[in-house]
């Protein structure tokens, strides 16, 4: 095995019986339930912050505890969302290790196909769906702590599409570099944000913001990406997504 992909989950589910994929119980520190999966709550972890950091608690744990030390390529998917590929699984076909090795010969990062907002920018979409002040604060933090990323942030905000879900596969070296930068920004944002008045959905702030920051990191580092369709094992209601997009934009 030269690759390892973590599958973030918060519940018992069906997972590929393939050593490429390893389910990891995110937010395990917040529950007494043990599904028998790898947990994000041992050694150095932020498992207890899962309600705010979402699947990032798995990434932080893997990064800080050198989980990927024996492989060259690393990644993250979700219990119901995988990259499309040629490996049969649960009525779908998902990414195989052979494809990972092949695709990453000519690309730096495997990413989900972009979500296109069509009628609004990345910036206005975030402001309609979440809180503008958090986006403004994140931009300020980047200007203060990582000014070389400021132009990439501004560029992304003006675009009308981006990669979502915090799904990727990349080299271990790129992963370590990304984690170091990402958590520097997010932990500073955490220091400056009072979540006490956020409802459970909006309290997932750092998960939402990291989706934007992932794109900023890709842009700034001029990384060559390969877009891959996302297989949603539970299906996806695109009409409902379109309705909610319009509702947030015009009825907020």
Residue ranges and their predicted role:
Residues 1-252:
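ER/Golgi luminal nucleotide-sugar-dependent glycosyltransferases, focusing on the catalytic module
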